[in-house]
């Protein structure tokens, strides 16, 4: 198997499912991009720049629990290369952000399958996100995915 490791910044929306107090849906997208981190005496500077290429699209279903945890499943399509399906490892968590009007959270997903170049994929994806009161999501993924050789 061949290992690929990459990071993407997704932006999109999350919101409640009509008729359910605990279920939500999320949709977000990430363009092809470069991420830059510079460490220096003046602190940490970061930047994300969109570049030419295709985009990734995430679609997921979330069920939240009273203790601030949640489970999630869904798919991420990586342009025309294919997609992966995922489910939560254990439970994710959400908490109030120190920035008023935002919630922050994190979750780890296991890759349960895929298609196209991702057929037979395995691996883990971490998601570290912030959600505004209006449902706008900024979500940073780090993926370690194993692809079949050939």
Label each region the model flagged.
Residues 1-150:
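Beta-strand-enriched cores of mature, soluble protein domains
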